[in-house]
């Protein structure tokens, strides 16, 4: 039987400091924090997705996840329903350094405009808007 997947439910992000990472995603990207599981793990929720935060050094048998637990190797693109200039202004207000952008890119749904920064672990964070021009 052949099938296709429908959407992404969650992903696991490896981080050096769960508290610092969770606070950054809450403050900068407006995500909601949630504790889950018997071990009271930390997740970040947004839209219909979530990011589970796995601390570096957590026992492999406690997490069913990637073979290598390395912080700072992620490249994540998030969609925002605001203009790119608003993203730039918000990142500046949060004290987050912009690495690149606004720049035109091709997303899953077509042309978009992206602004790039890094989270506390060095993961590349792309914040994109489906607007036709960088302004």
What positions do the PLM features span?
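Short, conserved charged micro-motifs
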Residues: 20-21, 83-88
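N-terminal beta-strand motif that seeds the catalytic metal site of vicinal oxygen chelate
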Residues: 1-19, 74-76, 130-135
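Helix-adjacent hinge/juxtasegments
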Residues: 66-77
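Vicinal oxygen chelate
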Residues: 1-4, 88-135
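Residues that flank catalytic or metal-binding motifs in active/ligand-binding sites
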Residues: 7, 40, 47-49, 72-74, ...
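A short local loop/turn or secondary-structure capping micro-motif enriched for an aromatic residue
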Residues: 52, 59-63, 133-135
């Amino acid at each position: 039987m052949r099938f296709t997947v429908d959407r992404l439910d969650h992903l696991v992000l490896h981080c050096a400091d769960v508290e610092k990472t969770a606070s950054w995603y809450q403050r900068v990207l407006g995500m909601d924090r949630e504790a889950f599981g018997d071990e009271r793990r930390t997740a970040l929720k947004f839209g219909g997705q979530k990011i589970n935060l796995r601390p570096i050094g957590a026992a492999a048998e406690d997490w069913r996840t990637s073979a290598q637990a390395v912080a700072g190797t992620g490249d994540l693109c998030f969609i925002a329903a605001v203009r790119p200039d608003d993203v730039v202004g918000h990142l500046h207000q949060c004290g987050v350094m912009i690495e690149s952008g606004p720049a035109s890119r091709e997303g899953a749904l077509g042309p978009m405009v992206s602004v790039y920064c890094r989270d506390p672990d060095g993961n590349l964070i792309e914040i994109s808007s489906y607007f036709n021009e960088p302004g």
